[in-house]
């Protein structure tokens, strides 16, 4: 469970809700037609940009923003070096049955044990990386689309409200309440875009970048293990994937 995402998302929404409660009547900020225009319109516009299957599949990708727990790259390096040491001393078949934490690394080692060539293994793993990134990018695209559509639908709802207000100006006392209702759609659109969609899109993008880096690290690890590379030489290559502050510490192990 990613506490930072939950805290940021619900904390941001909580601040908005708290300000509404402290500022006056809650009912003033609730208007069903405005909600229908913004929420319904936003999702319909988003559906125009991606397929229904991608739209539904994106919600599974969204869970990664809250449930994602990746393996630190330094741990991947440590595991890869251990496997490389065994493979160099006892042969690649000695890795069969090893308990490997990272599934992608485990898949790569199994391909090596099955006797596939280095080129074939690299091609299959690279394809897996690209397809996974495509799936993640669909989720990111959906939330970016929501972030773009929500304010626009909010503005459309506000314009609808203004037209209705201007068409019924016989009673001056009704102008203020009608204007408030018209502006609610803009508020809803801004909240959906800036407090929900944009933060989730940014989080998914950060997770995708981190996973891509980890998988490229594994890709190079598998190639080194399969080629019988010296574990120390492999370690020197892999520490390049770490932040500068962690490279010297990891290289000294």
Regions found by a protein language model. Name each.
Residues 4, 8, 15-139, 211-253:
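Large intracellular
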Residues 7-10, 14-26, 128-207:
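Helix-termination/interfacial motifs at the ends of transmembrane alpha-helices
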């Amino acid at each position: 469970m990613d506490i930072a995402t939950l805290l940021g998302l619900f904390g941001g929404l909580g601040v908005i809700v708290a300000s509404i409660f402290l500022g006056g009547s809650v009912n003033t900020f609730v208007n069903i037609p405005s909600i229908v225009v913004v929420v319904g319109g936003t999702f319909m516009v988003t559906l125009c940009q991606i397929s229904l299957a991608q739209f539904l599949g994106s919600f599974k990708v969204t869970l990664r923003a809250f449930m994602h727990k990746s393996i630190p790259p330094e741990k991947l390096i440590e595991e890869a070096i251990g496997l490389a040491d065994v493979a160099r001393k006892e042969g690649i078949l000695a890795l069969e049955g090893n308990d490997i934490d990272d599934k992608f690394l485990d898949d790569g080692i199994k391909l090596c044990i099955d006797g596939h060539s280095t080129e074939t293994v690299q091609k299959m793993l690279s394809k897996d990386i690209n397809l996974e990134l495509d799936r993640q990018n669909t989720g990111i695209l959906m939330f970016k689309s929501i972030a773009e559509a929500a304010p626009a639908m909010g503005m459309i709802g506000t314009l609808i409200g203004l037209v209705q207000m201007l068409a019924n100006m016989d009673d001056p006392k009704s102008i203020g309440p009608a204007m408030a209702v018209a502006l609610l759609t803009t508020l809803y659109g801004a909240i959906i875009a800036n407090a929900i969609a944009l933060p989730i899109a940014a989080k998914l993008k950060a997770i995708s970048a981190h996973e891509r880096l980890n998988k490229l690290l594994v890709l190079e690890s598998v190639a080194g293990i399969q080629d019988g590379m010296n574990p120390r030489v492999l370690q020197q290559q892999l520490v390049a994937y770490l932040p500068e502050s962690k490279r010297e510490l990891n290289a000294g192990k």
